[in-house]
């Protein structure tokens, strides 16, 4: 990326390529995640203005990046935030009102222009976002309503002759509410989200993860362990599957509750070195009827609890249990894959320079590929070297081993790693966003540096 920027106390102007987002990103997010192959930076200009701490204004114009180049799609938008708590000098509370407006213009492809115009579909899509943020005495509340504009989709019933309309027009919208409490070692966060036709593409015609112009992460527990990530949840943002079923799902509705508690040292349960407990429950359904909050078919349900305990100054353990229910048909029917997952993560520090970490995992299931077991051993020679080896074995069905060994070296701000192994087809996830990874056996080499 490249840019030139000028900033003073109240104004800033940026010209070039830049990243930004409106609100939570449901309406717009220009960002980069190299693990997922996402980089939809905007090439254009951005202007910001701040009036004391009372008001923040931002206007952008740009062409999103897709793949290795910038597209002809044009994005224009503005964002405004008003801090009522600063205006009225509320020292013990925070209250802000925010709003955004966005317009995306994508020129019709040759050969489609006339048909789309006759169907009443326009090249410009206009959206908006309204938000409120409040905090007082450790409690917080966030609310957002997004209207992402009119979308068009190919009508699966047109090809079968059941409909004379070649295209379907849908209104995209989303609602997000988060509330919680943090204080005295306790953290509670409850979220509700409803998504309906929230797919927002940079360019029509491509279903790649990197083609999205907004940010819609999975709002559920995010796992890093091998077996707990066999079926990660990816949100439903509107799906049409043509074919024998001509299945159509407008989105999802659901939420999660996340609870954390830190038992203090020398308390009854904390013991000599304390104890940390974390639990999460999340559930999501299809939308039974468009334009309503009525839930339909179960898509995903997860319950997990993990406990972290330091036994000695050198030995620490983390123990996880997860119950996952996953619908592999995207809600076409009520089939569910159920898994019970157990993980022990043990870390021992032999000296200031040498530590080892051992993961032992087991997945029990009567569905899909049945039972799995996995183990990982990691040896760290601080601060430069790290080596690891792992094996994930499907002993309940295919009897296949998925092994991996690797080595990394870190110096200053640069990390070089080399790994070799067999990888199953699945998903690679980062920050609640996932993309499909093909099965392969081979080597991976990476260099990560910061300037």
Specify the residue positions occupied by each region the protein language model found.
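Acidic, small-polar-rich N-terminal luminal/periplasmic segments of exported/outer-membrane proteins
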Residues: 1, 18-24, 30-32
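Signature for the C-terminal beta-barrel architecture of outer-membrane proteins
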Residues: 1, 33-373, 377, 383-399, ...
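N-terminal cofactor/phosphate-binding cores enriched in small/glycine residues
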Residues: 1-8, 12-14
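A contiguous, mid-protein "functional segment" used to position or interact
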Residues: 412-414
């Amino acid at each position: 990326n490249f840019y030139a920027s000028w900033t003073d106390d109240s104004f800033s102007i940026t010209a070039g390529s830049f990243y930004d987002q409106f609100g939570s990103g449901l309406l717009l997010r220009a960002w980069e995640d190299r693990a997922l192959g996402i980089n939809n930076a905007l090439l254009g200009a951005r202007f910001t203005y701040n009036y004391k701490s009372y008001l923040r204004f931002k206007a952008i114009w740009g062409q999103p990046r897709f793949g290795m180049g910038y597209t002809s799609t044009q994005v224009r938008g503005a964002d405004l935030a008003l801090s009522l708590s600063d205006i009225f000098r509320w020292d013990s509370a925070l209250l802000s009102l925010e709003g955004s407006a966005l317009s995306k213009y994508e020129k019709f492809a040759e050969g489609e222009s006339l048909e789309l115009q006759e169907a009443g579909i326009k090249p410009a899509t206009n959206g908006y976002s309204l938000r409120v943020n409040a905090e007082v005495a450790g409690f917080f509340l966030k609310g957002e309503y997004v209207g992402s504009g009119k979308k068009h989709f190919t009508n699966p019933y047109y090809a079968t002759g059941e409909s004379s309309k070649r295209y379907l027009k849908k209104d995209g919208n989303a609602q997000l509410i988060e509330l919680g409490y943090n204080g005295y070692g306790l953290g509670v966060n409850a979220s509700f989200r409803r998504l309906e036709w929230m797919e927002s593409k940079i360019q029509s015609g491509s279903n790649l993860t990197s083609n999205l112009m907004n940010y819609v992460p999975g709002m559920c527990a995010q796992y890093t362990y091998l077996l707990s990530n066999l079926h990660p949840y990816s949100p439903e943002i509107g799906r049409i599957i043509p074919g024998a079923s001509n299945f159509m799902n407008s989105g999802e509705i659901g939420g999660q509750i996340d609870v954390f508690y830190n038992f203090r040292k020398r308390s009854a349960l904390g013991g000599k070195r304390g104890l940390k407990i974390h639990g999460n429950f999340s559930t999501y359904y299809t939308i039974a009827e468009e334009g309503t909050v009525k839930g339909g078919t179960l898509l995903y349900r997860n319950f997990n609890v993990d406990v972290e305990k330091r036994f000695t100054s050198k030995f620490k353990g983390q123990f996880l249990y997860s119950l996952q229910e996953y619908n592999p048909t995207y809600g076409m029917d009520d089939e569910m894959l159920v898994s019970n997952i157990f993980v022990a993560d043990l870390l021992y520090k032999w000296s200031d320079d040498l530590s080892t970490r051992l993961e032992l995992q087991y997945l029990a299931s009567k569905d899909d590929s049945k039972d799995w077991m996995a183990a990982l051993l990691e040896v760290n020679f601080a601060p430069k070297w790290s080596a690891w080896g792992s094996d994930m074995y499907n002993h309940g069905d295919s009897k296949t081993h998925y092994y991996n060994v690797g080595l990394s070296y870190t110096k200053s701000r640069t990390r070089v790693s080399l790994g070799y192994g067999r990888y199953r087809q699945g998903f690679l996830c980062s920050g609640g966003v996932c993309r499909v990874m093909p099965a392969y056996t081979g080597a991976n080499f990476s260099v990560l540096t910061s300037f």
